[in-house]
Amino acid sequence: FEFMDKEFRKTYDYLFDKTEKLFYRDDSYFNKTEANGKKVFWGRGNGWAIAGIANILKSLPANSEYRNYYESIFRSLAQSLIKLQDGKGAWHASLLDPDSYPAPETSCTALITYALIYGLNNGLLTQQEAYEPAIKAWNVLCEAIHENGKLGWVQPSGQDPKKVTKDMTATFGVGAFLLAATEM
């Protein structure tokens, strides 16, 4: 855990925006902005981050000296993400510019849903703050499943927000959906 913690803290200190309380994908995005003039925070990237922190917490012993640090970051990131959820329950490819990417993006929605439900199931988030957002997100995910079982609205592999359509899918999106299902 010591090595993981050392590397995570370096990454957190470097890529976490203390104002927006979100993670940049990498340092090439520090000075980039979206069409609306806001910073670029990739939905799936922040989904990976909060899901990863949930997995760190799953691995840490209850009495770990590291637990409070990761619980604090988890709660802060969850609260930021909840505020950015759209009215239907989805998150978008660009967290701060959903108008440029109006379609729901299911890989980030699934990763965030997994983390929110993990937080609820483990007492890290309250019912009042996270239950409704988690259920709304789960419903969006279920509605994104085609009749043939394909999960739609998954942004293809990439490194930044891109437009997504109902017919786009990828295995990592399905994996994120299944991960969320493990906490339901």
Report each predicted region and the residues it spans.
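Loop-centered beta-sheet repeat module
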Residues: 1-54
